[in-house]
């Protein structure tokens, strides 16, 4: 389902734990890390799509999370032609996304990357909040920056940490890589 401009409606999920670290998933059989995300089906609201994608990709149910906020508007990114399926070329430009900020109220052990027969991730880890900006594929970086900045205001409002909002060019850059943050342990699906 594409909109008139050629963008597929989609939801993105920033899931945080009690330390405000973000869930970071490794795409199956690739060395690409990203946040959970997925398309909105016809007749589905963004919230319904978010809960469906959360279960399909991370194995979590609504009772495992609390919604802290969402982006106000659609955030768009264009997908380079070489990533677009042949049958979509000429029509498909990219994704438009509503991003949700969720707090895990369950346990790490509630995460199940094999909740469906078509898993998206084969490993996951908790990462510092801004690390994904340095590790995500380039064409998604601006949307990640917008989503993380907008939702950081909600997440960090009580801690006065919004002064660390990341800027694409001028902000501080982390030297952490997905293999070196937090506890240094990736969770492998099995």
Curated annotation (Swiss-Prot):
UniProt entry tagged with the keyword Hydrolase: yes
Enzyme Commission code(s) on record: 3.6.1.-
A molecular function GO annotation: pyrophosphatase activity
Motif (Nudix box): 38-59
Protein keywords: Hydrolase
Coiled coil: none
Cofactor(s) recorded in Swiss-Prot or TrEMBL: a divalent metal cation
Gene3D superfamilies for this protein: Nucleoside Triphosphate Pyrophosphohydrolase (3.90.79.10)
CDD domains per UniProt: NUDIX_Ap4A_hydrolase_plant_like (cd03671)
Catalytic EC class: hydrolase
Residue span of region Disordered: 167-190
Domain (Nudix hydrolase): residue spans on this chain: 6-149
NCBIfam families: PRK00714.1-2, PRK00714.1-4, PRK00714.1-5
Role of this protein: Accelerates the degradation of transcripts by removing pyrophosphate from the 5'-end of triphosphorylated RNA, leading to a more labile monophosphorylated state that can stimulate subsequent ribonuclease cleavage.
Family in the record: Belongs to the Nudix hydrolase family. RppH subfamily.
UniProt protein name: RNA pyrophosphohydrolase
Source organism per UniProt: Bordetella pertussis (strain Tohama I / ATCC BAA-589 / NCTC 13251)
The gene coding this protein: rppH
């Amino acid at each position: 389902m594409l909109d008139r401009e050629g963008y597929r409606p989609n939801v993105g999920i920033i899931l945080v734990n009690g330390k405000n670290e973000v869930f970071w998933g490794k795409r199956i059989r690739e060395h690409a890390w990203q946040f959970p995300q997925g398309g909105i089906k016809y007749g589905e609201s963004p919230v319904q799509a978010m809960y469906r994608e959360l279960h399909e990709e991370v194995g979590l149910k609504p009772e495992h999370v609390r919604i802290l906020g969402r982006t106000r508007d659609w955030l768009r990114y264009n997908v380079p032609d070489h990533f677009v399926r042949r049958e979509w070329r000429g029509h498909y430009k990219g994704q438009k996304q509503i991003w949700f900020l969720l707090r895990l109220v369950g346990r790490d052990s509630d995460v199940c990357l094999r909740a469906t027969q078509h898993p998206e991730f084969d490993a996951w880890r908790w990462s510092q909040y801004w690390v994904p900006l340095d590790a995500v594929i380039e064409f998604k970086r601006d949307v990640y920056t917008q989503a993380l900045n907008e939702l950081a205001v909600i997440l960090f409002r009580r801690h006065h940490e919004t002064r660390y909002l990341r800027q694409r060019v001028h902000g501080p850059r982390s030297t952490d890589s997905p293999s070196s943050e937090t506890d240094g342990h990736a969770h492998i699906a099995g």
